[in-house]
Design a protein with these regions (language model features):
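Carbohydrate-binding surfaces of carbohydrate-active enzymes
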Residues: 224-227, 236-505
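Glycine-rich phosphate-binding "P-loop"
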Residues: 1-3, 57-65, 424, 430
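Substrate-binding/catalytic cleft of secreted carbohydrate-active enzymes
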Residues: 18-302, 307-314
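Non-catalytic positions within long, well-ordered alpha-helices that form the structural scaffold/packing
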Residues: 9-12, 35, 287-288, 460
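Short, surface-exposed connector motifs at secondary-structure boundaries
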Residues: 9-18, 82-86, 439-441
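N-terminal carbohydrate-binding accessory modules
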Residues: 1-11, 32, 211, 432
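Aromatic- and glycine-enriched glycan-recognition loops and surfaces
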Residues: 2-26, 448-449
């Protein structure tokens, strides 16, 4: 019990109030700890595969009966715990919707106190809601109706954090209730589709997706985040038991062979800072969305398997990696989050900066308050302040607009936009950058080429101005620029993409 309390107290200090157990059910001590701390628990049946009907290929009735009985045992032994709130039939399942619906129906007849779902991200590109679903968990509502910020390349299209310029303006409401039809996912002529399955891929049967699919039950976004950081080699010494950090040792050896080991600490800190920025935007996109019922971050701690997925702000021991404190994390992950909505973190000096302040609030006692919004340079110089009294409107409140004019600066200068609800612990901040006024370069007399050729070289020898804008498709060894960390584990998903004959990450 003490260890479960330790782990869950740490998670709760980071604003987490919910645990989903990937294809497993924890022991009773976990439920006791969750009861004591106020954590919502969602155990899953121990299954990640295809639910078949009798007579179908690979049908195993004995296995299916075992799974169903496991579910009844979970309800019998743990169902009375107040924390046992939800239950899932497994992870990323395929197969018979009828059997899944019947299984849930049996559990509801036995114990209807819980909320049930057919699974987490079932049918992947072909999402659906069955009759007995109490809520929906997934990553998309159609091929291009995405409800999380990042994806593996084998699950493309990629998310907004991977493809868009950094901003604080994304939400999923127009995706959940779209104004126009989305693109549906196509299946092959034999009615199959290739999917990622653990660390590999498999082929499953699928029917055409409904591009207009709109769940009429609460929507939970599945396994969000997954932003990887560089290894912290100082963690190697923490492995004092039977397990050793051989993966970290290999990574360190590779870095040393390249003569880059002195940069290891910088790589760790810089990649971690970027990962935290990605997580902040990921979480705030959820909290900005009025039509989302919740989220399940894949993990707040590192995962040592699947090729090494260092996606946590905590390491595998649940210790802080020093990238962000729990109080800083709670600015954008809590039962009340005040946010600013704006289009760019970079503002030209002398220009106007506009932001919209809003509050996502699940505190019944918070009926209203006063917003204080301040923009200041890193030096402490206050550019402007806006104060606004408001009345809380349910779970989501549009508070006000704020507009500031940035002063002239001679060099790139950091500014901080701060928001707080006066007299509470609800506050948030955004690091902005003011850049000097950009003078446009006159290139009217320049000769522009997309490659270095004889004509370009001849013009250069004549003293002419030549600008080379390369064709990116010809730069075989280049890395596409984007402001985001790798997803989960580069090596694992690179292999899966190659198996599925899709582009490398």
């Amino acid at each position: 019990l003490e260890e479960w309390l330790r782990v869950m107290k740490i998670s709760k200090s980071y604003g987490m109030n919910h645990y989903r157990y990937h294809t497993c059910c924890p022991p009773e001590s976990a439920f006791i700890a969750a009861d004591m701390l106020g954590i919502y628990m969602e155990p899953q049946l121990p299954f990640w595969g295809t639910i078949t009907e009798e007579g179908e290929e690979n049908h195993n009735q004995e296995e299916q009966d075992f799974l169903v009985e496991e579910g009844f045992n979970m309800l019998k032994f743990f169902g009375n715990h107040p924390s046992y709130c939800m239950m899932s039939m497994g992870n990323e399942l395929w197969g018979s919707k009828k059997i899944l619906n019947d299984i849930i129906g049996g559990y509801k007849k036995f114990d209807n106190r819980h909320l049930y779902t057919q699974g987490s991200n079932n049918f992947q590109w072909f999402p659906n809601v069955i009759e007995n679903d109490d809520f929906f968990v997934g990553v998309r509502l159609a091929n291009d109706r995405l409800i999380r910020g990042s994806y593996a390349m084998c699950d493309a299209p990629l998310g907004h954090i991977q493809t868009d310029k950094p901003a604080a303006n994304h939400d999923y409401d127009s995706i959940i209730r779209p104004q126009k039809q989305a693109n549906s996912t196509e299946v092959s002529e034999d009615g199959t589709v290739q999917i990622q399955y653990g660390t590999t891929m498999k082929t499953v049967k699928a029917s055409e997706a409904d591009a207009d699919f709109i769940p009429e039950v609460p929507i939970v976004t599945h396994e969000i985040g997954q932003y990887e950081t560089y290894p912290n080699f100082k963690e190697i010494e923490k492995y004092t038991g039977s397990l050793k950090a051989r993966n970290f040792e290999i990574f360190r050896e590779r870095l040393e062979e390249k003569g880059l080991l002195p940069l290891a600490e910088d790589y760790f800190k810089c990649s971690g800072k970027l990962a935290v920025q990605c997580y902040k935007e990921e979480m705030e996109a959820v909290f900005r969305s009025r039509l989302l019922g919740g989220f399940q971050i894949l993990d707040i701690q590192d995962f040592s398997g699947q090729g090494t997925a260092l996606v946590g702000v905590l390491n595998a021991f649940m210790d802080s990696k020093g990238l962000i404190t729990d109080s800083e994390w709670r600015e954008f992950c809590n039962d009340a989050v005040v946010m600013a909505r704006f289009d760019s973190y970079v503002i030209e000096a002398g220009s106007s900066f506009k932001a919209h302040a809003e509050l996502c609030n699940y505190r019944p006692e918070l009926k209203g308050g006063k917003l204080i919004c301040t923009l200041a340079l890193e030096s402490g110089e206050v550019i402007g302040k806006v104060e606004k009294d408001f009345v809380s409107e349910g779970n989501y409140t549009d508070i006000c607009d704020a507009e500031f004019t940035f002063p002239q600066v001679e060099k790139n200068t950091k500014a901080v936009l701060s928001l707080e609800i006066e007299g509470t612990d609800i506050h948030n901040h955004y690091d902005l950058w003011a850049i000097p006024t950009v003078e446009k370069t006159d290139i009217s007399g320049a000769y522009i080429f997309d490659e270095v050729n004889d004509e370009a070289e001849s013009l250069l020898k004549q003293g002419k101005t030549v600008l080379i804008v390369p064709n990116l498709s010809r730069l075989e060894n280049s890395i596409e620029g984007f402001y985001c960390q790798d997803f989960w584990c580069y090596h694992m998903f690179c292999i899966i993409s190659q198996m599925m004959k899709k582009p490398d990450p």
